[in-house]
Amino acid sequence: YGAAPDGRPFSPKNFFVTIGGMQAIEIATRLIVGPGEEALVPTPAWPNFVGALEISGARAVPVRLDKGTRWSLDPAKLEKAVTPLTRLIFLNTPANPTGFIATREEIAETLAIARRHGLWIIADEIYGRITYDGVRAPSFHDVMAPDDKILFVQTLSKNWAMTGFRIGWLEAPRELRPVIENLVQYTTSGVPVFNQRAATAALEQGEAFLTWQIERCRRSRDILCEGLARTGRVRFFEPEAAFYLFCSIDGFPDSRALALRLIDEAGVGAAPGAAFGPGGEGHLRLCFARDPDQIAEAARRMARWLAG
């Protein structure tokens, strides 16, 4: 499966099965950072990564994404945030919550920064297959050398909607194998075999489902974006990937208060942007990985609420 999308061979010795992508992230952070050390995190970002750093006693240093004609990563801002305590860069692309895809150039420059400063990279590319309009998400696999210090996180939860199975994997340099195997052994002792068999079936036979899933998400994205754009009050960049719309609504700067009002008064659930760190406040994250008819109803409810 790894060789097919990226067109290059992979060794099984570089892969470690984990209890979901979250355990892969937790193991990766334990490998690299300790108390008092720092990790650079482009934000808005999924908050669980910050939590994993805090468990290790490390500190997340937010580096805000630029918001011009699209969400984008400024490598100069990233490098400016490096200090003697910095140990790693975490990059989630395609990204939750913004749906932004880092360009090949942004990825290559991030890798160059890591090389110059001796940093590790944790590459969370779990939404890499869920892209729209014929776009391919660039990967660190496209630009890395065999000796680069990169840990890749993956999960079955997104592509194949297997969230409840709690299965993912960590791809790492093989010299880390003994340490990673011990961390798995001392925490969960491994992933249940029947879950691994389900994951194998998804990887070997799940392309048709993934194609259907992406097309359904694309239709839902278009319905949501078109419905909210017609209100004239909702501001957003159309997501290039993943299945989230990160938007702001004129007149509502407090995202938590807005999210509570939406669920109470319009019957639409949304995540407040403040939960995703610097750059998130004033936004909402709407998930459109649902049936298009449900998304159309959500857009209608929001439009009626805004009009009222």
Per-range role (PLM):
Residues Y1-G308:
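PLP-dependent class I/II
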